[in-house]
Amino acid sequence: MPGTGLGRLAKRMTAAAAVFFISTSAVLPAQAATAPAAAPPGVPAALKAERAITTVDNGNLHTWWHDNGVFSPATPTQSSEVRRSSFYDVQVAQANQPQKLYDAFSYMSIPRSGKGKIGYTEEDGAEFSSDARLTMSWSSFEYAKDVWVEVSLRTGQTISSADQVQIRPSSYNFEKQLVDADTVRIKVPYSDAGYRFSVEFEPQLYTAYNDMSGDSGKLTTEAAGNRPIHTEPRNSMMVFAEPKLRGEQKERLVPTEESGSIHYPEPGEVRNLNSVSEEIIYFRPGTYSMGPDYHAVLPANVKWVYLAPGAYVKGAFRFLHDTQSQYKVTGYGVLSGEQYVYEADTNNSYHHLSGASNCHSSCVKMLQFASADAEQKLDLQGVTVAEPPYHSFVVYGNEQTFHMNVENYKQVGSWYWQTDGIELYKGSTMKNTFFNANDDVLKMYHSDVTIDNTVIWKNENGPVIQWGWTPRNIDNVNVANTTVIHNRMYWKDVKYNTCIFNSSSHWEDMGSTTKADPNTTVKNMRFENTAVEGMTNCAIRVYALSDTENIHIKNFNIGAWNGLEWTSQVSHLKRYTNSAGEKVTIGNEVPDGNGLALENYSVGGQVIEKTGGNSSDYQLGRLGFDGENWENWNAWKSAP
């Protein structure tokens, strides 16, 4: 939040001081420190001198700070604290005043929030990220004109050229300048959509490998004898440059007294939201904590939760009732699930899921809604959801009447399995978002859905785009401008639920080929401008459970295949049957143009063509589609 405090530590310190820093949980301002577990590799060995913090809030730029920020790279924070990045500092200047820099708080997430496995020993999906000591930092600000963003590396590692810093998505092509040996300056032009991008210093890059053990292999950072999967920063740094709201947008997305009655929680412990009498809950800048054994189950009168820029809320919200016609969750604040254990079970005192429970019904979700038979709408805008302990967003009830408008949403620190992206319901739109997810990211289960401008950082589990798991009726889906900047999908065996595009086999029995329904149809889905930066495991696997027509994938570009054998990277197009042996159909693509179309699908810059000698399973295209479906797909290069 806006304020003054202590900022950068000195460019160089004595070795003794550096050792002291990495051995403690450094707090700003100074307060009692706690000794953490072993510090991650790359924890600052050379620190920067403290100076006064300066933030700004004018018509063109808004940054904020948390005076209770703590350096805690390996252990949980206290309820009253916000974890500050141990690896990066961020400052922002208006482009016409480049020397007038303002501080933007750099948040940080670590696997399991440093808690370890509490109350369970089974796998939770965070094993590799925890063992490899990965972290994710991010910084947000609002802007209305071009800015310069300075990102400084706190580790003592140095660069000698701005070319040693990569911005992803690389298509942004931002101007970069070297400021000094650990700082790069990035020109971010104003856009009504904003920008969400990764800043990647070369000394921070590492490669994840498959150790080739067992059926699937396991991820490791050891190169010897292993196969490369993907290269990414060990300690990532995301920048969220968000448009400053004005006019009608501000009126729609920022509550005032005219919007309804407002409850303003006080910073600190917040465990009384189940009984508020107002219509709107407004979190002002500050730190709020619900604790590990509570989440807000909101009364029927609450229609809007607003998280102001600089609000940091440790908790989750459940809109229990289905009586409101218009819901809103908006604001550039943070909603963090860091205090919950993985699969926190509300039927088991918020401990890890008990054997008697079903996580879909009883586990904490960061945002949960109930839908009625009457038409309902949700505006979900601006919020950063951090460290979800399970699904980040669900709606239970009538899925055909709940319509969503999602804008400038971000999801970070998704270390656990089942930390999906967002399922969009019938008639919904989503644009200008960032997802770090460890399960299905874009879930295309409903008709009349439009998605545009999505940046994705994909962890191991699940595919990027999913429309399977059960037979469905889907019509009219349009997804454009999707960039996968990183992914760690690594399996050496052929999984049913992976790749960039996927329609998985049935969730009840993924090995079954007899759970399809020819009375359902998936049709008229268009995916345009999908870019995968770096290496990945496979392009598309469709195990059709419904009749399928007119699936058009245009301008799908993969940087490279990972280091596994082609047999691990093969794409599939299969048709399954119902229990009576009736097989679903796929539309005829050659010549009718009603099947699966791959227009300008490329790998490493080479376009894959069905007649070009590069499309087969063992060739560059890796298209191992069933022979019976030969007429149901095509791959070709179209004119620019």
Swiss-Prot record:
Record's signal peptide: 1-32
Q: Which UniProt keywords apply?
A: Glycosidase, Hydrolase, Secreted, Signal
Q: Where in the cell is it found?
A: Secreted
User: Where is this protein chiefly located?
Assistant: secreted
Task: Report the pH sensitivity of activity.
Answer: Optimum pH is 7.0.
EC number assigned by the record: 3.2.1.11
> What does the record give under GO molecular function?
dextranase activity
Which superkingdom, per the lineage?
Bacteria
Task: Provide the top EC class.
Answer: hydrolase
User: Which cysteines are disulphide-bonded?
Assistant: none
Cellular component GO terms, alphabetical:
extracellular region
Gene3D superfamilies noted in UniProt:
Dextranase, N-terminal, Single-stranded right-handed beta-helix, Pectin lyase-like
**What does the protein in this record do?**
Efficiently decomposes water-insoluble glucan as well as dextran.
Q: Please state what the protein is called.
A: Dextranase
